[in-house]
């Protein structure tokens, strides 16, 4: 579980970094509200928003799955989520070539896998 908490904390820090990036870009480009139609501003906003859209649900599902699966599965899923979200952010901001595709694909596959794992685990629970 320690790996899960470290990854969750690092994802939280990534949210902070992307938030600061949007704020600084707003000041630099003099865009107070919205995206001003600026492609770089749009990418910064979407990198931040996409992390907020996916990370909390994925973290919750991984945490729930930790009741059914061991340390290594939970740790592996946590690290994959962190790497996928970092790749996506880097790709959106033009730092990591193919990062957007790899990050989005990795996140979507992880979300599907953990969801299926929980459904299967739920059906295998004993009735009390």
Regions found by a protein language model. Give the residues of each.
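Juxtamembrane loop-transmembrane helix junctions in multi-pass integral membrane proteins
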Residues: 2, 40, 44-47, 65, ...
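Residue-level signature of the transmembrane alpha-helical core
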Residues: 9, 79-82, 105, 109
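Interfacial loop-to-transmembrane junctions
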Residues: 87-113
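Juxtamembrane boundary at the C-terminal end of a transmembrane helix
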Residues: 116-128
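Cytosolic, membrane-interface loops and tails of multi-pass inner-membrane proteins
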Residues: 20-46
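Core segments of transmembrane alpha-helices
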Residues: 50-62, 111
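Alpha-helical transmembrane segments
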Residues: 3-18
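Mid-chain, well-packed structural core segment of small domains
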Residues: 58, 65-94
């Amino acid at each position: 579980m320690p790996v899960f908490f470290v990854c969750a904390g690092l994802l939280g820090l990534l949210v902070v970094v992307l938030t600061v990036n949007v704020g600084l870009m707003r000041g630099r480009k003099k865009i107070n509200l919205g995206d001003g139609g600026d492609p770089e501003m749009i990418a910064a906003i979407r990198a931040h928003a996409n992390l907020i859209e996916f990370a909390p649900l994925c973290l919750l599902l991984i945490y729930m799955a930790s009741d059914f699966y061991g340390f290594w599965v939970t740790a592996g899923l946590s690290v994959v989520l962190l790497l996928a979200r970092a790749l996506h952010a880097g790709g959106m901001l033009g730092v990591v070539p193919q990062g957007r595709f790899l990050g989005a694909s990795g996140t979507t596959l992880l979300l599907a896998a953990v969801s299926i794992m929980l459904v299967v685990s739920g059906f295998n629970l004993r009735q009390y």
